[in-house]
Curated annotation (Swiss-Prot):
Annotated transmembrane regions: 1141-1161, 1288-1308
Top-level taxon of origin: Eukaryota
Stretches for region Disordered: 781-803
GO BP terms: maturation of SSU-rRNA from tricistronic rRNA transcript (SSU-rRNA, 5.8S rRNA, LSU-rRNA); positive regulation of transcription by RNA polymerase I
Gene Ontology cellular-component terms listed: 90S preribosome; membrane; small-subunit processome; t-UTP complex
Alphabetical list of InterPro entries matching this protein: ARM-like, ARM-type_fold, BP28_C_dom, HEAT_Utp10/HEAT1, U3snoRNP10_N, UTP10
Name of the protein: U3 small nucleolar RNA-associated protein 10
Coiled-coil regions, chain positions: none
Cell compartment(s), UniProt: Nucleus, Nucleolus; Membrane
Record text on subunit structure and interactions: Component of the ribosomal small subunit (SSU) processome.
Amino acid sequence: MSTLSQQLSQLGGGSTVDRTWKLKQHSKSLIYEPQVAQDQDFSFIHAVGVEGLRDLVSLDSRFAQFENNLFSDTSIDVDRYVQTQEQNDLLDKAISAFLSLIGPYLMLSPAVKALEWLVRRFHVNQMNAEQLLLCVLPYYDQDIYLRVADVIIKLPPLFVFLNKSKSAAQNPPRNLLIRAFSADMRLFELITEYIVGQTTTKTSYQRQLSFWSQFAIYGLVADKADPERMLEIYLPALAKLVVTIDTDCQIAAYMVLTVLGNKMPLNKEVFNALVETIAANWTQKAIKSGILCITQMYQQKQEPEVLPTSVMTALNKAGFQPSDVVALSQKYKMALFTLGYCMALLRNPDAANFKGLEEIISNTQFGSNESTFLMRYIVDWALAKETNTSVAALAAPVIAKWVTRGETVPELDQLELKLQTVFTEAAVEEMEVEEIQEDVDVESLVEQAKKAASQTTTYFSTKTSENYAELSKIFVQLIERGYTMDKFVSMFSSDIASLTFFARIWASPSPLLARLAAVEAAKTIITAAGEADFQNLIPYTCIALSDASQRVRKAAASFAEVLKSKQNKKPIWGVEKIYTNDCSYLGSGDVTVLLNALSLEECILDESFVIRQVSDMISKKKGYKSAFSTAVLAYLGSHAVSQEIIAIRTSLLTLVTSSEEPIVPTTKVVEPLYINPPNDLAYITELIRTVTDKTGIKFLESLIKNDSPIYDEVCDIVTQRLVKLWPTLKGDAHLGLFRFFVDLSLDKDVPFDSLDVLAHVDVPTKVFISLLDDCKVEQNTTSMDAPSDESTKRRRRSSSSTVRNLLQGKLHHIAERNLRKVSLVLELLVASKTTDDALLGPLFTQLGEILTLGTDSNLPIDYCQSLLADVLLNIIRANQHDGASIDRDIRVDIVVSAIRTASNAQIQNKYLLLVAELATVAPTLVLHSVMPIFTFMGANTLRQDDDFSVHVIEQTVARIVPCLAGNTDKVDMLLVSFVTAFPHIPQHRRVKLFGELVRALDASGTKDALATLLFLFAQKSAELKTARKTSEVSAIAKFCDSLFKLFDASKQLAVVLPYVTLVQELYAIIATDPKTKEKEKKTRRQIFLQVDKELEVSPIDFLVVLLESRILPLQAGLVQSPEALKIAENVLTVLIESQYPELLNVILSLLPLPLFVTVAGRLGSSVYKTVLARFSSGSIEEEDTKASDTLLESLHSLLKSTTDTGDLVLLLQIVETVASGFPKCSDALLVTCAGEAVAQLKNSDDDVFIQAVSVLSSLCLRLGARMIGLFPATISSVLARDSSDNLIALSVLALFATFIKRLPSFMVSSLPKIFEFALKCPADTDTRKQLFVVCVETMDSRVVLQTLCDSWKFVEGFENARLFADTLDLAVAEADKKQIHSKADSLITLCLEAFDSSLKLEANTAARVQNLFIKCLIAIVLKLNDKTFRPLFVKIVDWNTPERSTLLFKIVCRLQENLKSIVTSYYGYIIDLALEILNKASAITPALQRNILSSLYSSFRFDREEFWNNEERFTKISDALGAQFPYLTKVAPENSKLLIKAVVALCELASEDQKKQLNDMMIKLLRQAPLYGSRCFAALFNNVGEEFLPFLPQLVPQIAELLESEDEKVESAVRAELIPAVEEVLGESLDRYLA
């Protein structure tokens, strides 16, 4: 037979699928959990949405439009499932507008609230899911997306790729979206259309556009992209976005267009249309992005195209300048746009455009093909017929930029002729742009030429420059017109005039064709000339052979062949005629060698070949004789000196300086040119290259000193030349030049950077030594004053007269200049990284000078001192292995003085590092000065808190401390210095610093450094404690603990004995009489700080505390290190005989168990018991069985013999610890110890009793059944103990719990006594409950249930009753059905006993107890079947008495509510009792009436068997209920609602006749109890409605009568409740029936 609970579970399955679906749909919420959302009504949700909308309106007034539709009050009643299609279309339109507008605010709480209303009321998550997703998709990586995705029941088809992330409640990864957008063009088209629509309605926003552009670009670069389909989607959308006035829209479109233009092929029409559309529509803020877009779109072109006029107009209007092109080109690849822009500039060829063009070409990095294309384009434009000469001339500077970079095009020669110029920057700058008259005839030009040519004898003079300019111009025009050169040659008065003219043409900037014609004309003249040596033309022939044009070089080679044919002829042509000065000449043999060496064929092929050949000649390479080289150099140099035309002289100097290596005679050859050279950079450059010796260097110095327009460029060239010359100079030259540059650097008026030269050359050590000697103060001051003996005195001597002198204006200036000079020399030393030890003496001398200067004046010497320290450090470190050879130059006393006088901490640190390095090189020298160093460190450096200072201290300690090996006094002084400085050392630096100090002392062989240091801190701590400086004492203790941690166990234990020795010495000194103390003061060690008075705190206590804080690590160290263990044994050997028991105990507590037992055996029992306290911590891990057994035997003996309660507690704690911490110890010994613990249960001391109970609990867990023999004595002793003390009660409860948990079967007989103890003891409820829980979970349920049934008599008070009820409830739940069936009668009896006991309590307490046991009763009943429970229910009914009736019906009501229709028929056992009570109105109480009515209401409500439809039963109960209405008015009006609910529930069960019977009864009651009767009728119409309409004719007259009632409450109830209820069912007003 099934249980009642199983029957109950089969009920209530009446919910339809439709209702479940609607509930699930209603529970979908963006804000609330489903279980909360399903209970919310639409009014509440609407209020939330309206609140959100109001906040949105405050942010954006456009939201106000939705107050009257989506969020109106009438929207609460809108149901889109019953609306017409037209109504739903309007609703969708409003929803679409709202979703379009809400996008930017989705991260705000008001937006979520407003959207909540649309989801809950209009189901946008179903009906508008696609648009909702489009709205929220830009937030795909935010929490709002997860919320929206969660409420969408089914994703639209295009968004099914989001299903996985939706199911996992995770944001979709970026890669998923990229793949989806790339693979499904329909999806991307949908999103693109949505974005375009947003821009049309001006509701787009930055995040949305960024999202779209980002994934649009990903779609473009995807491998699966279909170009045609992409263009079909992209171009219309982009065209719409570009023309909007929204900046963000435009920028998003530009981003996509940039990629589109480079990814997809666009035809010319589409491309131009896009570019022009961009330019025509960009907003002010989008201009920069638009321009960048256009530049990148042009990169997809195959070749450059001129920018359209409309685009250029838009660019100009936007303020786009050529400088902007340059700036962009440095960041982006945009060469094709730049070319198109440059080409477009030529459309309007004015000066401004060409200036911009020049700026672009000068500052933009073009590729070779691009550069050639643009150059050819500009040249073709300039050569075009429609381009006149004056306009074409504007392009000359632009073309010159290319030519100077070595670029050219074939058409350039024609342009040079057209413009009558050569394309070099210099020539173009001098060129006058004027219109050349094309209509001038040749005859006129010839006449002008004849006139000009006849006026000059040589054109190598500056006096002929004007004539040359006029004639060269005519010459070019005649060439352009094809005039015969023979005729032109005949115009000159002499061959000197003609040849110098033509040589000047080809040797200076001229058009190519002019240069070519000049060479050929000269060849014609030479060929026709008579016998002569034309060697004066050889230098100019070399210039022609180095021409950039191969045609010119070929002509020059032919000219040279003619010269060869004229060699060895007499006389020399042009002597004293072509120059105003005479020059050197070559012998005929040398001329032959020179001409043959030129290798003309190679010259034709390589323009630089002739330069290399001349270089070989003058540098004596390739076997040329010295005399020949010298002659050639003198020959070329003299021509350069004699030539007055600067441009030609520059070319000639190029030949002179052709050698890469400096040639000494060069300077002498061209020396005349060093006087007042013109400010021509090319000329000065070549002139500087001629410098090779002292004379030339003087020229370079003059260039540096004299300002000029090209000063900066000249200085750069001078620097390069000096760096190159430096290795070839001799010592004196080095020193002189070095002094010049140092003095120059001191001159603030000269901007030349001397250090730039000196930093790039290797300066000999001797030069530095000489310079340092120059820097001595006495050297500089004696030049003004007579020498005196005082100046020869040593560094540290100064006098008042010296100070006065230094403070005098002039001498002060000299001292300041001297200091700057020293600094400069030292900077160079640092830069050169010179490490020659020869510098040590001068440097230390200079350091002494600087210190004296700083002491005797107010000059700043910090920088100079710092540099000196750096140099000295470099030298000492480089020469560490040569200490014996350099220690004679070392002056440690000066270094110490520098440390003590320095005002800057960093400088002090550097010199401390220097001392540290010196300690390695010369330890003996350092030792004499070590204490002043450490005294200074203690007062200064240790207080610094920077990393460099810490490094300095560490290095100083590491290097200097080894010098102290064996010197105890100095070690003591060192340690005292550090301890004294301790308060000033930054806290986070202390531990590392002192650790390094100890390690350094240990490494140097100093013994007991750590012990001495701790001893000093102990004295310091005692002193501070006396002064009541608690925080400082704490700081020392914390520091010493941290310092101690740095060392291993061996080192820590090794501290003890030397520390104790020091303490003993201290106490011995303190005990000495004052006179002896005074005598021994000078010989006493400095570490004994406090010897004049007794110490309030013993240093031993300091060590004890320190060791106690390290017990666990030390114990581990002893186990791991045999060395540490040996040290511990030695320490114990000494301490056993000492007077320091505390220290002895600490050391003993560190020992491993075997050693501990061995050592302890040698001590007295009192010490043994004290030391045993360490085992009470429970943290020992030991597996030595023999040692643990020995310990247990000792403990057992002590437990027997000890009577002191404190010792007993301690021993019992140790037994407990051993039992839990030593798993391998003997169980038999533990049992003997347990017996002793049981014996101690009878001890009168509570602490001993409690500890004994605790020990027995622990031993029970360990031994289990082995303790069976001790159980009777244990239980009896424990229960016999007075349990009024809370601690005792708690310990006993814990013991019982352990016994029950470990040995449940042995505790059955003791369980009643345990329950009694638990219910009576004063322990807190939670602890006792834990015991009951253990019992229920561990022991047999029958035993527990029976024990509970027998234990109710021990329950007193509510807390115990609740504890008992909770235990019973738990026990019932733990038991199975069979066990409950077997104890059912006893359990019901137990509940009835509890109910009886509750009746004796105060009302509220009684109700609480009754509720607890009714709950237990129901739990019991649920595990019973009907056959078992029915007799028990009868037993409960039989238990009833008049006093118990209220409780009985309360029980019945709760049973009805929990068991529902299963127990409806059970009401038959109590119906008579209920009727009897209800019909005796005088005997019923309000509580009894309430419980009866509640039970009836529950029974009516769950009646599924027509139990109450029985005529007799129905009549009796309806009459009884009717009888209660008059009673309500008199006694219990508070039960009226319950009575009415019961009547309505009965009516819902009734048949037609029974309803009529009930109606008749209620009509009568309207007269007896009109108020409650009318309310009852109102409830009936509200619930059974139409079924009561047939009885309306009977009711209407009664209503009319009640409306006339004098009782206002009755009239009000009828109007407010009854009439509306009737009208609601009737469907019309009652007025016409009541009229």
